[in-house]
């Protein structure tokens, strides 16, 4: 695969640590793509507590782990994704939420849609009610890590809505040409909406894979919920941008 998974992270809780260990291991097991993790946080938790767990189970020669020390309480996912886009060197990239797991075939179908020239952006799940919210306690975590199979996640799951978050597969040059991520969206909220709107408005062909996405459930901090102190700013920015036509959007960027 001429593909790199871009995983921005700040590991603020034990369940988020389990989730990134799980998703990175799963990606390395089931694809031959590159994976780059960039942690921006006061401490390099992934390197010192996560990486060894991944190495117990899979070859990590395709994995790169980056770290930037930061005491800023707000995690700017958009900025970290932009850093990762520049760091990558493959024809295609995938923004990837560390709490996201897909059926194995979905990765390959999304990649094929890009590689065959059918699409510029692929959402590897359907829009509607195609999210499995998977309970991910220690017992399920241990079972999943031993099998690396979504069958384990099917034991305790709840159907929920799915729209535009989690992960997107993208032609890297198109991504750059369309201004990458908007770093004015700080911490959590509305950045995924704006990205979809912009890629569509600028003429990219957007496709979907007809399947589900699993979300490994976790506790929420201000960096992953409406309690983000910058959420209102993000919301107002999105409400402004979504009124733009193509030329106004290009002028803005």
Would you name each region that the model predicts?
Residues 91-101:
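Short beta-strand-to-loop acidic/aromatic patch adjacent to the donor-nucleotide binding site
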Residues 2-6, 34, 194:
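Cell-envelope/extracellular polymer assembly enzymes that use nucleotide-activated donors
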Residues 71-87:
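Glycine-rich, basic loop-to-helix element that forms the pyrophosphate-binding segment
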Residues 1-26:
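N-proximal low-complexity "stem/linker" segments adjacent to membrane-targeting elements
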Residues 16-19, 162, 184-253:
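C-terminal catalytic/acceptor-binding lobe
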Residues 26-69:
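Acidic donor-binding segment of Leloir-type glycosyltransferases
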Residues 88-91, 180:
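Active-site acidic short loop of glycosyltransferases
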Residues 103-183:
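Conserved catalytic core of nucleotide-sugar-dependent glycosyltransferases
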């Amino acid at each position: 695969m001429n593909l790199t998974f871009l995983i921005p992270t700040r590991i603020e809780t034990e369940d988020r640590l389990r989730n990134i260990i799980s998703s990175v291991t799963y990606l390395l097991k089931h694809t031959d793509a590159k994976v780059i993790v960039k942690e921006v946080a006061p401490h390099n938790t992934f390197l010192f507590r996560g990486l060894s767990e991944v190495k117990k189970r899979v070859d990590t020669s395709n994995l790169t782990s980056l770290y930037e020390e930061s005491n800023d309480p707000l995690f700017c996912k958009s900025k970290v994704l932009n850093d990762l886009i520049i760091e990558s060197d493959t024809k295609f990239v995938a923004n990837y939420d560390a709490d996201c797991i897909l059926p194995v075939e979905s990765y390959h179908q999304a990649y094929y849609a890009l590689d065959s020239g059918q699409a510029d952006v692929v959402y590897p799940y359907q829009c509607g009610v195609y999210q499995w919210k998977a309970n991910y306690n220690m017992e399920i975590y241990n079972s999943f890590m031993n099998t690396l199979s979504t069958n384990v996640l099917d034991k305790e799951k709840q159907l929920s809505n799915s729209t535009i978050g989690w992960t997107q597969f993208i032609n890297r040059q198109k991504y750059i040409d369309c201004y990458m991520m908007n770093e004015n969206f700080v911490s959590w909220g509305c950045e995924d909406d704006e990205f979809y709107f912009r890629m569509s408005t600028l003429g990219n062909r957007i496709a979907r894979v007809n399947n589900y996405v699993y979300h490994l459930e976790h506790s929420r901090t201000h960096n992953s919920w409406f309690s983000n102190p910058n959420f209102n700013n993000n919301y107002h920015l999105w409400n402004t941008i979504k009124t733009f036509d193509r030329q106004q959007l290009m002028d803005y960027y």
